[in-house]
Amino acid sequence: MKEGKLKKIIKIDWTIFYSKPRIQILGILIFLDIILLFSVTKEMEKGFNVSSVSTSIVLFILFILLNGLFIFYYKNKFPNIEFYDDYFIFKKEKVYYENLKYFFFKDNRLFQMKKFSKILYRPDGGNWKKIDGSGYDYDLFSVFQKCFLEKNFSKAVKNIESGGVEIFPFQNQGFVKNKFLFSSQEGLQELTQIFESSPKIQVSNKSVTFDNEIYDWENYNIEFEIGTITVSDLKQNTILEIETKNTVICQEILLKNLIENFDKKYPKFY
């Protein structure tokens, strides 16, 4: 049963679909076959054998069928994703945003900095699963993060202000990507152990801790700009810099907003 208001439906991006090399090859073959069919038809008017035309027609139908199979395959591989107030539906499964663990592989190629290749997520108490981003527009990730943040930000702020700590495991993207990008469903479950033993960023109402290095809000500037987390002293000397484009951070958008929120909250005495 579907609950709450439907906010957005993300569908397959067919422009990405038709940019796939094998689809381009198929299109070229279809184009060549059309030319062949046209040429043979013209030659038929001059008295050529009917079998040539029949062969061309059969090839044309075969290419059309192959094109249909490709479309069917990609439609099933990249199903619609429905976003509601409290959850999203992917492959008929309802996944709640609250306490959802996730991270994503960034596409660091030139001109692709706003792209992502995969989202790996684990519902509260569930198993790790993945969404292949190659068949969707970047809008999918924007909606995903916005919905997640709306459901978890206020709760995280309240926890920190009450004396609690929000913890964000992080790891080198290359390590995680090489190990899990093509993993089976069973292999993905190792991610839980990987992140339990990974370095962690901890946010409290007094400070941010980067793998046991503590920086309090009052004496340091802590910024999370696009692609980089920077810690600097009050004289603007950089103390620590983490390039997030090469790092996977669990619940990265939540970490970014918490850092922005608490860094502004505390006055700096230069």
Give the location of each predicted region.
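Short, exposed beta-strand/loop patches in secreted or surface proteins that constitute
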Residues: 79-83, 198-203, 221-223
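Membrane-interface amphipathic/juxtamembrane segments adjacent to transmembrane helices
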Residues: 78-93
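Phosphoinositide-dependent membrane-docking surfaces
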Residues: 88, 94-110, 208-229
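N-terminal membrane-targeting/pre-transmembrane regions
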Residues: 1-33, 38-47, 101-173
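Alpha-helical transmembrane spans
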Residues: 13-79, 186-193
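N-terminal recruitment modules of adaptor/scaffold proteins
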Residues: 127-128, 132-214, 237-239, 260
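Eukaryotic low-complexity, acidic/Ser/Thr/Pro-rich regulatory regions of large signaling scaffolds
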Residues: 230-270
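A short, sequence-level motif marking secondary-structure junctions
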Residues: 97-103, 133-139, 218-222, 243-249
